[in-house]
Amino acid sequence: MSEGESKSTHFGYKTVEADKKAELVAGVFHSVAAKYDIMNDVMSFGIHRFWKRYTIEVSGARPGMKVLDLAGGTGDLTAKFSHLVGDKGEVVLADINDSMLKVGRTKLRDKGIVNNVSYVQANAEALPFPDNHFDIITIAFGLRNVTDKDAALRSMNRVLKPGGKLLVLEFSKPQHEIMRKVYDLYSFKVLPKMGELITKDADSYEYLAESIRMHPDQDTLKQMMVDAGFEQVDYTNMTDGIVALHRGYKF
């Protein structure tokens, strides 16, 4: 790349300048933040709760641990982690989008979850935390929105303690052809109409469908985690691979 030539990346199926993607993604989540939880239930038929519950089970969170819920949005995982780590533990709900953080903070405070949770507006590519700080890091349905995923994974590795675990819960690639066809039909024909009906914003849900297709598949993401310094990396497909949970350790 010649000097002065800007880097490009994808925003859904569109090619955009890399330094513009974060702003475009922010616009999506500013738009949908208020109805984000409702849409999660509707568009996944509630199955996202199972995916997240499995993530919590795999995490091995225990009293006294420090947990980073990155791209934590409205705080579903944070709420569960708060109970598991107890008064001597700490959960940081971090998100780059202040609208999502506000919704998450309000929701958790309404549930009485206040003592061991803090909120940080942070870019996953340059996390504002000390080295070797967290026992567990989760990023659920957030990595595909990050401009430089490799930089984000390296940043997560840096702030994770030796012996710590990273869990990446993300949309991925269905494993069977019939599921791929049904999923494509649902994603591109039904999902935007749901978005228009519930949030008055079909475009954001068109972006969602496109961003999922542009996200690395299961094995590619596994290798990206290895390249970022994680060890014993593996993944579990859920709902035929519509979603995958990747796990890796720092030693």
From Swiss-Prot:
GO terms for biological process: aerobic respiration; menaquinone biosynthetic process; methylation. S-adenosyl-L-methionine binds at T74, D95, N123, A124. One of its GO terms (molecular function) is demethylmenaquinone methyltransferase activity. SUPFAM superfamilies: S-adenosyl-L-methionine-dependent methyltransferases (SSF53335). Keywords: Menaquinone biosynthesis, Methyltransferase, S-adenosyl-L-methionine, Transferase, Ubiquinone biosynthesis. Pathway: Quinol/quinone metabolism; menaquinone biosynthesis; menaquinol from 1,4-dihydroxy-2-naphthoate: step 2/2; Cofactor biosynthesis; ubiquinone biosynthesis. PROSITE patterns: SAM_MT_UBIE, UBIE_1, UBIE_2. The keyword Transferase applies. Its EC number is 2.1.1.163, 2.1.1.201. It is an enzyme of class 2 (transferase). It catalyses: a 2-demethylmenaquinol + S-adenosyl-L-methionine = a menaquinol + S-adenosyl-L-homocysteine + H(+); a 2-methoxy-6-(all-trans-polyprenyl)benzene-1,4-diol + S-adenosyl-L-methionine = a 5-methoxy-2-methyl-3-(all-trans-polyprenyl)benzene-1,4-diol + S-adenosyl-L-homocysteine + H(+). Methyltransferase required for the conversion of demethylmenaquinol (DMKH2) to menaquinol (MKH2) and the conversion of 2-polyprenyl-6-methoxy-1,4-benzoquinol (DDMQH2) to 2-polyprenyl-3-methyl-6-methoxy-1,4-benzoquinol (DMQH2). Belongs to the class I-like SAM-binding methyltransferase superfamily. MenG/UbiE family. This is Ubiquinone/menaquinone biosynthesis C-methyltransferase UbiE. It comes from Shewanella baltica (strain OS155 / ATCC BAA-1091). The lineage of its organism: Bacteria, Pseudomonadati, Pseudomonadota, Gammaproteobacteria, Alteromonadales.
